[in-house]
Amino acid sequence: MSTTIRASQLASSISPKTEEKQPSVFDIIAQENLATSIRPALQHLVKYLAFFKPKTFLSVHRNFDEYYIIFDLILQNHYLRNYGASFTENFYSMKRIASGTGNPPNDGRERIMSLITLVGWPYVENKLNQLYDRLKEVYECRSWSSINGMKAKCQKMFVIIWPYIKTALKAVKSALQLAYILNRSSIHSPWLYFSGVILKHLTPEDLEAFNAVPLHLQTGYQISRGTLNEHIHLRFFNRIWRFILGLPGIVSRLFAYGLFFVQFLDYMYNTDLAKLTKTGLDGAIPSPPHKMIISESEILSLDTNKCPICLKKRVNDTALFVSGYVFCYTCINQYVNTYNKCPVTGCPANVQHLIRLFV
């Protein structure tokens, strides 16, 4: 009888490991939205800094893709190695588990494949999208049959095939998400399949392991071996160690909140709400709308320092790459965002064709 009671007491004293649950589809959508918003938020911030400090940040703005992939590689590698998840997955209390071994992808093939899908593929996809937009705009005003050579044929094939590839990837992802919602699949994205991992929620044991103090710094390990003076020093180093362990989490939270703030600023300054709040406050009657296409003969009659859109002295000179004409930054940015063409030549254009002139 006593043996049975003792066994039951031992069994109750051992706390069972918390069951690992998969995140809900709402958590996954929130995580993916945050992941896709980091790059444009940082790009907007760099663009803002390049406007005020061109000597320091202009090169970063022009080569943003390359700087960002280095930053993203360091960030994701740190979180995969230490927390077994990407930055945004860790922010929403998720972790990656290798499908074959059940271990976190801290090392080995799973971590390399995770870095490829988290960092490498978004960079390649962004470059391919830029190439597609550039080729499509160039050949909109030309006939494919007028261009000969293997290079032109490859470009034509790419322009035709790339939208279908993107559509196929989106269809596969949508099918996996539907299967995930119906509990028919343990993954919601093809990139998790390529990485060989699945997503799970962090457990209390995981959080405790992240904040664990090494054995040689634990107070209980040293109190029986040292003097009171050594114990005081040990508590001091223990607190320093806990501060160091908590510092990355604090920085990551501040970084994420900063991204939300940058998104808010971008929404306030680049949406119709901003236009409504900026106009009509002083009661002045707005000027009549400008003629949207200006002939080149009219441009030649203007002073060299006048903007072809507002017909005033240019502010923040900005050249349009597709035509070579120079405008005010505000004028040409609003025009291109609205009409997607050059106001003089009518050639297709977008904001990527704007070149700031710092003279």
From Swiss-Prot:
Topology with respect to the bilayer: Multi-pass membrane protein
Cytoplasmic topological domain residue ranges: 53-56, 129-133, 282-359
Naturally occurring in which organism (per UniProt): Caenorhabditis elegans
Annotated GO MF terms: ubiquitin-protein transferase activity; zinc ion binding
Domain notes for this protein: The three subunits of the retrotranslocation channel (PEX2/prx-2, PEX10/prx-10 and PEX12/prx-12) coassemble in the membrane into a channel with an open 10 Angstrom pore. The RING-type zinc-fingers that catalyze PEX5/prx-5 receptor ubiquitination are positioned above the pore on the cytosolic side of the complex. The RING-type zinc-finger is degenerated and only coordinates one zinc ions, preventing E3 ubiquitin-protein ligase activity.
Binding residues annotated for Zn(2+), in chain numbering: 307, 310, 328, 331
Gene expressing this chain: prx-12
Alphabetical keyword list: Membrane, Metal-binding, Peroxisome, Protein transport, Transmembrane, Transmembrane helix, Transport, Zinc, Zinc-finger
GO cellular component: peroxisomal importomer complex; peroxisomal membrane
Pathway info: Protein modification; protein ubiquitination
Subcellular location: Peroxisome membrane
Chain segments annotated as transmembrane: 25-52, 57-81, 107-128, 134-184, 254-281
Family annotation (SUPFAM superfamilies): RING/U-box
UniProt family annotation: Belongs to the pex2/pex10/pex12 family.
Complex formation: Component of the PEX2-PEX10-PEX12 retrotranslocation channel.
Keyword Transmembrane (UniProt): yes
GO biological process, one term: nematode larval development
Pfam family of the protein (one): Pex2_Pex12
Peroxisomal matrix compartment segments: 1-24, 82-106, 185-253
UniProt zinc finger (RING-type) residues: 307-346
Function: Component of a retrotranslocation channel required for peroxisome organization by mediating export of the PEX5/prx-5 receptor from peroxisomes to the cytosol, thereby promoting PEX5/prx-5 recycling. The retrotranslocation channel is composed of PEX2/prx-2, PEX10/prx-10 and PEX12/prx-12; each subunit contributing transmembrane segments that coassemble into an open channel that specifically allows the passage of PEX5/prx-5 through the peroxisomal membrane. PEX12/prx-12 also regulates PEX5/prx-5 recycling by activating the E3 ubiquitin-protein ligase activity of PEX10/prx-10.
Highest rank taxon of the organism: Eukaryota
Family matches, as PANTHER family: PEROXISOME ASSEMBLY PROTEIN 12 (PTHR12888:SF0), PEROXISOME ASSEMBLY PROTEIN 12 PEROXIN-12 (PTHR12888)
The protein's name: Peroxisome assembly protein 12
CDD domains linked to this entry: mRING_PEX12
